[in-house]
């Protein structure tokens, strides 16, 4: 029961941080704002997150976990690699473009988010890589683990790149192209 309360409180704080960031922007959001929005004391917020930096990073990771959940749903009906990759890319690209906060932050205060997607990106990259390794492992056949890991890292890095700079072309076109390139590379390198 205590663990559930801790998880609920953590989620409440993250929801409050999201709402405050939408309302005030990331730079202007304070821990006091988050505490007020969550209807908790500042001390409670600080018990869960030692700094605003930690809170924003946790928020970034939670939003990435939401993308991953959406991608899992999208790829589930696709036992073959290419359609699964297309579904993964289309879902992620749409999710990134439709995210209520991402475009706003990238347009008005990119310096608040970019560190989590560049110099401090290892946890973000790791989550994306694990997702894509699952996709490749389940669908790529006899591809070496090293090549699978490299392809997964490439995909994760592309997702981060598209989060920072959206593609100029339609999501479906980008997804088809990326899936084609990856599948050709994997088949050729077997």
Label for each model-derived stretch:
Residues 1-24, 28-37, 54-57, 62-65:
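Basic, helix-initiating cap at the start of DNA-binding domains
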Residues 58, 72-98, 152:
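Hydrophobic alpha-helical connector segments
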Residues 65-68, 113-153:
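Amphipathic alpha-helical packing segments from all-alpha helical-bundle domains
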Residues 7, 11, 15, 61, ...:
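Generic detection of well-ordered alpha-helical segments
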Residues 16, 20, 44, 70, ...:
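Amphipathic alpha-helical interface segments
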Residues 96-122:
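Amphipathic alpha-helical segments used for helix-helix packing
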Residues 38-49:
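Short hydrophobic/aromatic patch on the recognition helix
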Residues 104-107, 118, 138-182:
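Hydrophobic/aromatic-rich alpha-helical bundle segments in the mid-to-C-terminal region
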């Amino acid at each position: 029961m205590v663990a559930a309360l801790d998880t609920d409180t953590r989620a409440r704080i993250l929801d409050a941080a999201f709402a405050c960031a939408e309302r005030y922007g990331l730079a202007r959001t304070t821990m006091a704002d988050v505490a007020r929005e969550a209807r908790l004391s500042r001390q409670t917020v600080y018990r869960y997150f030692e700094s605003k930096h930690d809170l924003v990073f946790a928020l970034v990771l939670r939003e990435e976990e939401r993308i991953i959940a959406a991608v899992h749903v999208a790829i589930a009906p696709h036992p073959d690699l290419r359609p699964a990759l297309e579904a993964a890319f289309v879902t992620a690209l749409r999710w990134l473009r439709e995210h209520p906060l991402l475009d706003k932050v990238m347009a008005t205060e990119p310096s608040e988010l970019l560190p989590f997607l560049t110099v401090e990106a290892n946890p973000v990259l790791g989550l994306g890589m694990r997702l894509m390794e699952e996709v490749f492992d389940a669908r790529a056949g006899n591809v070496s683990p090293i090549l699978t890991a490299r392809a997964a890292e490439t995909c994760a890095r592309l997702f981060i790149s598209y989060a920072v700079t959206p593609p100029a072309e339609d999501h479906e076109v980008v997804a088809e192209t990326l899936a084609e390139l990856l599948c050709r590379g994997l088949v050729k390198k077997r």
